[in-house]
Amino acid sequence: MASEREQISRKVALIALIANLILMAGKVFFGLVGDSEAVFADGIHSAADVVASIAVLAVIGISNKPPDQDHPFGHGKAEVISEAIVGIILVIVSVYILIEAILSFVKGPSVPQYSALFAALISYVAKEILYRYSIKQGKKWNSKAIIAIAYDHKGDIVASLAAFIGVLLAIIGNSRGWSYLLYADAIASAIVAYLIFKISMELIRPSVDVLMEKSVDPELIEEYKAVIFQCDQVKRIDRIRAREHGHYKLLDVRLSLDHDLTIKQGHDIAREIRNEIKRQFSDVEEVLIHVNPYFEE
């Protein structure tokens, strides 16, 4: 039976998939009918979001599987892979939109219609709601997959806002005879491309760090040390390493205890420390503790 975390993750991803399908169809249609490069480009972005949502749905079940013989540390990194996939998709989309914006400058500006303006506005409102919901659930369940979806929605928010402003300026320019404002739609497309690329980097960089097993923040290491030193028998921490493994963390600790202690006493102390760390840090999945004998110098 799926855990509550997995059920919520699937629900968020499914809502994102359905919303992106509807918004994609609407923005592509009204972008073409309403003669707006920016809204059409935003629609292509939503098409990529559909692919991203499917990718996230595919890995949610995998990431929540318990450890097995082939994957003794669990499957948490599957979420990180989905985060990287979403980031790569957004890079491709940003490049495509930028190329289309440049071509729009070359062939000359078009005059967007009000239908394109309303499509951008509806997209902005819908994505704002979806972002707030997704980021809340992502942080609550410490899910990189859901947070990736939230960042994707965030990209749509700024993209739809830029498209709305660009279309509005172009419409105003056409009605007032200010021809230079007709280029606002194409400029908005270029801005959309930049903003999407920026958000893609916010997804790719941390996912690469996790896949390369970068250490957690030094401040968090100090918090782990403070918990360990709560045990009076600990004479010294020889080494402590911690890394993210998707939605949970793994710790490797070497510490020194008095050399007169028996193996059982050392084992019991290590178990108490392990349990206390996991009690205080709910996202810590495993703590491997190696005990060294301590001699007074």
Swiss-Prot record:
Molecular functions (GO terms): monoatomic cation transmembrane transporter activity
Main location: membrane
Transmembrane segments: 12-32, 43-63, 85-105, 111-131, 155-175, 177-197
Induction, as annotated: Transcriptionally activated by MntR in response to manganese excess. Expressed at a basal level in the absence of MntR.
Matching SUPFAM superfamilies: Cation efflux protein cytoplasmic domain-like, Cation efflux protein transmembrane domain-like
The entry's keywords: Cell membrane, Ion transport, Membrane, Transmembrane, Transmembrane helix, Transport
Gene3D superfamilies from the UniProt entry: Cation efflux protein transmembrane domain (1.20.1510.10), Cation efflux protein, cytoplasmic domain (3.30.70.1350)
InterPro entries found in the cross-reference section: Cation_efflux (IPR002524), Cation_efflux_CTD (IPR027470), Cation_efflux_CTD_sf (IPR036837), Cation_efflux_TMD_sf (IPR027469), CDF_Transporter (IPR050291)
Membrane topology: Multi-pass membrane protein
Disruption phenotype: Deletion mutant is manganese sensitive and accumulates high levels of intracellular manganese. Effects are exacerbated in a mneP-mneS double mutant.
This protein's GO CC annotations: membrane; plasma membrane
Record's subcellular location: Cell membrane
Family as reported in the entry's similarity comment: Belongs to the cation diffusion facilitator (CDF) transporter (TC 2.A.4) family.
Function of the molecule: Primary efflux pump for manganese. May prevent manganese intoxication.
Protein name, entry field: Manganese efflux system protein MneP
Annotated organism of origin: Bacillus subtilis (strain 168)
